[in-house]
Amino acid sequence: SAASDVYKRQVCGKDKKPRQAIEKLSIDGPYLLKADDGSMRAISVDGKGRLLDKHYKSIPTTFSFEVFSDNGERLFPVTIHSVSRPKWKDVQPEKTFVLSDPHANWSCFASLLKAGKVIDADYNWIFGANQLVIIGDVFDRGVDVLPIYWLIYKLEKEAEDAGGKVTFLIGNHETMVLGNDLRYTKKKYTQLADTLGMTYPELWQKSELGHWLKTRNSIQVVGDNLFVHAGLSKEFLDRNYDIPTVNEIVSDGLFLTKKERNADKGSDLSFMFATYGPIWYRGMVRSADKYHPLDRDDLRKILEKYNVNRIFVGHTIFDDITTFYHYKVIAVNVDNQENKEKERGHGVMIEKDGSMFVVYDSGKQEPLLTE
C-alpha cells in the first residue's frame, strides 16, 4: 500500500539501508487536501500516534470533524464553510477585541478568548455582532497550530451568522512556514510531512486551511483603527500603496520561498516580505537606529493617508500591552504563558466610543493608560 511504501521510504531511506526507527507521530490535523476533481483526502494523527489517511470521492456539503489538542483533549467540532477574502475595511462595532501572536499555545489562546467573553466553555462564539482581530502568528514555537487555526476558522462562520466578524491577519511566521523556513517549527509537524513524503508547506498548499490563509488580509481597518502584524515604515509610506493592493501582493507571495520572493529585487513582492515591509518592520515600536525608527511626522502622514487614528501591531514582544506616540501606536504582543501566569495584560478591548481596556486572563479589564 501507499502507506507502507511511505513507511519503507521513511525508515529505510532511498537506498533501503535502515535509518533510525521513526519516533511516534503526535496528535495533529486534520489536514483536508482538496483535489481538482472534487475529491478530498483527510490526514490526521490520532492519540495512539497512528496516521489516518482517508479519501472521499466527493466532499459532503456538511462535512464536519472533531479537533483534538496535542495532549489528546477533544476540543470542538468544525463544519467546512465557503471561504473568500474578507473586506479590508469594517465599520467600528460596539466592541473590538484585539490580540496577537498566539504561537500554537492552545491553553493561552483559549483562556484569553474566554476572558474577553468571545467564546463560551465549549468554544462557541458568544461575542454577538462584535469583532475579534488576531494580528498574525499562529505557526511555530508551540504544538497546537491546527486547533488554533480551526477554532479561528470555525468562529469566523459563527461570528458571521451572529452579525459579528473574525479577522485573522498574516504574520511573519505564516510567511516563514509557508515559504519553507521551518527554523521555529516543532518536529511533530515536519515529521508528519516527512512521513507523507512531502514538504510541510506542500501539506498546507493543498489544504482547506492553506486556501483559507491565502485569502486572509495583511492589513485591516476597523473604524478608525488600523491593524498590521509588525508596522508601517517610511519606506512603505513612500511606495504609496493602497491597502487592497498590499493584501493581494502578500497573498500572491505566501507560498513562495524567500528566494522566489526576492527574485526581482526592489519589486513590490520583494518589499512586502522584507525588513521594511508590514510583516517585519519594528521601527514603530523600537527606537534603535538599526530598526529605522519612524519619526512622528511620518506617522502623522501614514495615519492621514489611511484615514485612521491609531495603529495596532503585534510581532515585537513586550512585557505588557504598550503604547507609543501618545496612544497612536499600540503593541499587543506579550509573552502569552508568562503574562497569563503573572496576571499581566494579554489583549485589548476597544469600545465604540474609542475607550480602550487591557484584558487579563482573569477576565479583569482596566483602562489602557498612555505612556
Place the predicted regions along the sequence by residue.
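Short, small-residue-biased leader/transition segments that mark boundaries at the very start
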Residues: 2-7
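N-terminal active-site segment of His-dependent metallophosphoesterases
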Residues: 61-148
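A short acidic-Thr-Gly-centered motif at the start of a beta-strand
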Residues: 83-92, 123-126, 160-161, 218-220, ...
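Active-site neighborhood of phospho(di)ester-bond hydrolases with catalytic His/Asp-centered motifs
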Residues: 99-100, 132-136, 167-171, 228, ...
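Active-site environment of divalent metal-dependent phosphoester hydrolases
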Residues: 105-106, 140-143, 174-179, 234, ...
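Active-site neighborhood of divalent metal-dependent phosphoester bond hydrolases
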Residues: 141-227, 232-243
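Active-site-proximal loop/helix segment associated with metal-binding centers of metalloenzymes
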Residues: 193-195, 217, 225-295, 299
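Binuclear metal-dependent phosphoesterase catalytic core
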Residues: 329-371
